[in-house]
Amino acid sequence: MKASELRGKDAAGLNQELSELLKAQFSLRMQKATQQLQNTSQLKKVRKDIARVQTVLTEKANAK
């Protein structure tokens, strides 16, 4: 997911995306804890995506 794609969305869409990413992160953490996670790089990707969404939300809030 690119920041340029995120900037095209409105705040409600970004909040929904953030909620989905947080659920995915929780799920991945639980899989890691129970040693069921095969691809651990997914954790890093989701964490970076969460940061991107939060950054764009902050940019939109400060622009007002």
From Swiss-Prot:
Q: Where is the signal peptide?
A: none
The molecular function terms in GO held by this entry are: structural constituent of ribosome
Task: Read off the InterPro entries from this record.
Answer: Ribosomal_protein_uL29, Ribosomal_uL29, Ribosomal_uL29_CS, Ribosomal_uL29_sf
Give the GO cellular component terms, alphabetically.
cytosolic large ribosomal subunit
User: Keyword set for this entry?
Assistant: Ribonucleoprotein, Ribosomal protein
Q: Which CDD domains does the record cross-reference, listed alphabetically?
A: Ribosomal_L29_HIP
Protein name per Swiss-Prot or TrEMBL: Large ribosomal subunit protein uL29
